[in-house]
Amino acid sequence: MPGSRRVRPRLRALLLLPPLLLLRGGHASDLTVAVVLPLTNTSYPWSWARVGPAVELALARVKARPDLLPGWTVRMVLGSSENAAGVCSDTAAPLAAVDLKWEHSPAVFLGPGCVYSAAPVGRFTAHWRVPLLTAGAPALGIGVKDEYALTTRTGPSHVKLGDFVTALHRRLGWEHQALVLYADRLGDDRPCFFIVEGLYMRVRERLNITVNHQEFVEGDPDHYPKLLRAVRRKGRVIYICSSPDAFRNLMLLALNAGLTGEDYVFFHLDVFGQSLKSAQGLVPQKPWERGDGQDRSARQAFQAAKIITYKEPDNPEYLEFLKQLKLLADKKFNFTVEDGLKNIIPASFHDGLLLYVQAVTETLAQGGTVTDGENITQRMWNRSFQGVTGYLKIDRNGDRDTDFSLWDMDPETGAFRVVLNYNGTSQELMAVSEHKLYWPLGYPPPDVPKCGFDNEDPACNQDHFSTLEVLALVGSLSLISFLIVSFFIYRKMQLEKELVSELWRVRWEDLQPSSLERHLRSAGSRLTLSGRGSNYGSLLTTEGQFQVFAKTAYYKGNLVAVKRVNRKRIELTRKVLFELKHMRDVQNEHLTRFVGACTDPPNICILTEYCPRGSLQDILENESITLDWMFRYSLTNDIVKGMLFLHNGAICSHGNLKSSNCVVDGRFVLKITDYGLESFRDPEPEQGHTLFAKKLWTAPELLRMASPPARGSQAGDVYSFGIILQEIALRSGVFYVEGLDLSPKEIIERVTRGEQPPFRPSMDLQSHLEELGQLMQRCWAEDPQERPPFQQIRLALRKFNKENSSNILDNLLSRMEQYANNLEELVEERTQAYLEEKRKAEALLYQILPHSVAEQLKRGETVQAEAFDSVTIYFSDIVGFTALSAESTPMQVVTLLNDLYTCFDAVIDNFDVYKVETIGDAYMVVSGLPVRNGQLHAREVARMALALLDAVRSFRIRHRPQEQLRLRIGIHTGPVCAGVVGLKMPRYCLFGDTVNTASRMESNGEALKIHLSSETKAVLEEFDGFELELRGDVEMKGKGKVRTYWLLGERGCSTRG
């Protein structure tokens, strides 16, 4: 590459040392690895803090595999490739290598990684016949095996970058020319120089194309214009090696110079992905983003940019290796390894050392020795190896095949993502399926312009034409000229016809005077919005909100505004006719429509669209009208839109813009009036106070003129808009100056004098945005050239008020739509809440009353009392509960009953029963109602009683865990009557002698036993499965002697009474 300097060692004399004198130290079974890397500066990808953990992981794998170097011990010795300043040195590295060779006689050298350090060490090792392994030293010159005969590079090399670029050019059809730009800093390891060198030499060799190169200094701004000139003259496909910030600056300058992605493509040679790096490693990033105010332009510029990096392995072995590398680096080297492409280097050192050990093992197996460096090296070359970085292929020259990735920007998100991967072994480009290369025109730009860089293509500069071509050209030009002339003649005839037709003329007799009050009432009756209860009521009502000084009349049934002109007569000159035509041509939503003009003396007047809401000045001065900033921005935007149309049309400027000439129609759209028709302006304006009051909006340069132009100037309109803007912001009147009570004449005199600083209205920054105040100041600047045009004002207002960009009514309707949507969401939310509460209420009702009874009540039906022929009733209580309660606190009693009944409730859910009530320690359950179940009620209650008795035996009292709870149960079968009693806290109650008998059965029972009546026993015998025992005749109150039984259990169950 032109301009490159060869890497030469300064210690050439050391090569003269006899190899035999250096073979000292070590033992027969030791294999010594000499490491020559930066030991303190961790910024290098091959620093010892990064590579050391990888080497230890590799040696641990060697030790764990008995087939590798059996009987040998690998030991490491370290030497630094840094000088005193902590940077790689072509002096320190060879000195360290000589010291290590003399003292330890190593079998292999690991490193260096820096090019200028590796060059002399590589020559030394070739002379000593000792292999050198490195994952650095990627320069093209290290691959010259005449000098570096035993150097093996297991990491990326720049000559492989040239192979990738060659494949890229072939795929995209770039076969002629490329341009390479690189930032070079003398004094360091010159990474960009060596990156570009490999690309430059390989692409020229493989493609036989022209590759121009240009060096620059990042910190010197004078270099950048030269680079852009070089790009214009020599390149459309440009490769740039620099820091991410320098590349971004170049892209911004290229955008400003018009070097866009339609004709140019810029490749950033960022092999370690520094511009894409984040805390999470390589993820979709925005390398154009800095937050400095230029991000929007930078994003646009980066549409022409692509980024080339090494391809990061994604195989599971590499991911696991990274985890172990980070842990070991933090634990033993006190260094934090971050995610990123730099981790490829320590991983490559790891794989290289394993490859070397494999080669040594094979050499020893063939009868060789560890000092046979040439044989070992040849075993590593032209070989494939599966390492943590994946499939590793060392070519015939001892260089690893390197994979690369091409990153491109997603035009929608602005994030860069991988679109192409390059396989260094197969030399194939593989597209990423979900991503595609983005080209602004849909295809890549050519590497040479269509007509060449200097327009030298003869096809673009034909000086001679054939006779047929000349005739065709002359004929075409003649036809085009004829059509153009015909068009202008037709247009002129139409114009003259329109001027003569006087479509604008209105006869005074056709005007019918109107009653403003009558019109206001009719307009009010047609309003569809009511102001009552609205924040905007003062704008939506018809009382007192109109321009009461506007003269109106009916013309052809339509109400129009009539402006009398204080002139005796109007000469209809050609100039006046053109003014009237231009007024008829104006069609804009924010300019009042010109209806016509009456030129019949003495009734000379102008007719325009009537806007019933009055002028902007009326609205601002009416304190009963509430204007929030949404309304104010809408009014301001309407003025800007109207003035933008006016300035870009035939009328050019207004000349009399003020708040009283801005009117609001029935749809709350602000329109500008009193524009154009300068020939109709009053020749003798008012005198005194009125004259000066009307000039408060006039620009100072116009005030200083003896005869200012009737149509004013565009800069003067901007000044007037600035005054109106202050009126809208403060609502304190025109040209309000805080603390001063000046007459209009005094204000005009001070503005005209041109004081320093210029005399202008006050700005209360508390009442509006600071940016809006700055816009006012720019609009009323003393120098007309410093005032922004309305196009810029429109853009500025959009930034201030992004949410409300349309007129008042549209914004109002939008807000009402939001309210409706919010109301729908609220109704849905409340409906769901209601349904949830309804579900809870029904669940509670089902717990208080039987399900069938609760359904009747929900349907609004009356629950009638009902007689049941046969049901079974269960009663139980706790023996000794009164004494237990006396010895316990009230809270302990409540806790006991809650625990017990919670247990009981869980048990009875498994049976066809209904819990009637609990009173104290009494528990009442029934089966057979309200839903009849035949004779099954006795069986269900019997089984339930057995289950409860079984549950109570294992029940533990919290405050008396050693005490057994003694449950007493009584059961009886018979007829009952049941119904709902009460309106408040209704209860489902049972009535009849069966209830009393069941209660007697319980009170006459015994603890931990189930007492049955003979009626229940008779029903249970139908099921032939229960074990019963005769108790005998028992004396019961009100019953006499009654024969009763004990329920012992059910056959097939383990429960016993």
UniProtKB/Swiss-Prot annotation:
Query: What's the EC number here?
Result: 4.6.1.2
Signal peptide segment: 1-28
* Disulfide bonding pattern of the chain: C88-C114, C192-C241, C451-C460
PTM per Swiss-Prot/TrEMBL: Phosphorylation of the protein kinase-like domain is required for full activation by ANP.
Q: Which SUPFAM superfamilies match?
A: Nucleotide cyclase, Periplasmic binding protein-like I, Protein kinase-like (PK-like)
Regions that span the bilayer: 470-490
Outcome of S525A? Reduced phosphorylation, 80% loss of ANP-dependent activity
Please describe, based on the UniProt annotation, the reported consequence of changing S538A. Reduced phosphorylation, 60% loss of CNP-dependent activity
User: Which residues are in coiled coils?
Assistant: none
Give all residue intervals belonging to the Protein kinase domain. Answer: 524-801
User: Which InterPro entries does the annotation name?
Assistant: A/G_cyclase (IPR001054), A/G_cyclase_CS (IPR018297), ANF_lig-bd_rcpt (IPR001828), ANPR/GUC (IPR001170), Cyclic_nucleotide_synthase (IPR050401), Kinase-like_dom_sf (IPR011009), Nucleotide_cyclase (IPR029787), Peripla_BP_I (IPR028082)
Q: Does the keyword Transmembrane helix apply?
A: yes
Q: Which residues does the entry place in the Extracellular compartment?
A: 29-469
Which residues of the sequence carry a binding annotation for chloride?
S81, G113, C114
Effect listed in the UniProt record for changing S525E: No effect on ANP-dependent activity
Explain what the record says happens when changing E338H: Decreased ANP-dependent guanylate cyclase activity
Give all Phosphoserine modified positions: S515, S525, S530, S534, S538
- Pfam families to which the protein is assigned, alphabetical: ANF_receptor, Guanylate_cyc, PK_Tyr_Ser-Thr
Membrane protein topology class: Single-pass type I membrane protein
Q: Where in the cell is it found?
A: Membrane
Residue ranges constituting the Guanylate cyclase domain according to the UniProt record:
872-1002
What role does this protein play? Answer: Receptor for the atrial natriuretic peptide NPPA/ANP and the brain natriuretic peptide NPPB/BNP which are potent vasoactive hormones playing a key role in cardiovascular homeostasis. Plays an essential role in the regulation of endothelial cell senescence and vascular aging. Upon activation by ANP or BNP, stimulates the production of cyclic guanosine monophosphate (cGMP) that promotes vascular tone and volume homeostasis by activation of protein kinase cGMP-dependent 1/PRKG1 and subsequently PRKAA1, thereby controlling blood pressure and maintaining cardiovascular homeostasis.
User: What is the protein's given name?
Assistant: Atrial natriuretic peptide receptor 1
**Protein source organism:** Rattus norvegicus (Rat)
- Per the record, the gene is Npr1
